[in-house]
């Protein structure tokens, strides 16, 4: 019986780990789907305007849209400017 219990308990642990991983993947996908359709284009246009006036690496600019509640969204723009 101990051998059978060993294999059965291991399957439950494996299933639990797989379930947690799947929940993480689904949460990440929901995060990206919650963005409006226009956001990628908006990010590109903002980046092009910044690069027009300041010579920076595009990787030094981060743009995020945060949903604070049902009525409020915040567009956060972080730029690391050269010296």
UniProtKB/Swiss-Prot annotation:
This is Cell division topological specificity factor. One of its GO terms (biological process) is cell division. InterPro entries: MinE, MinE_sf. NCBIfam families: minE, PRK00296.1. Pfam families: MinE. Prevents the cell division inhibition by proteins MinC and MinD at internal division sites while permitting inhibition at polar sites. This ensures cell division at the proper site by restricting the formation of a division septum at the midpoint of the long axis of the cell. Keywords: Cell cycle, Cell division. The gene is minE. Belongs to the MinE family.
């Amino acid at each position: 019986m101990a051998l059978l219990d060993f294999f059965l308990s291991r399957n439950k642990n494996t299933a639990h780990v797989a379930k947690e991983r799947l929940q993480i993947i689904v949460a990440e996908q929901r995060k990206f789907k919650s963005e409006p359709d226009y956001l990628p284009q908006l990010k590109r246009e903002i980046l092009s305007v910044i690069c027009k006036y300041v010579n920076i690496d595009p990787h030094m600019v981060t743009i995020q849209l945060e949903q604070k509640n049902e009525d409020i969204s915040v567009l956060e723009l972080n730029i690391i400017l050269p010296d």
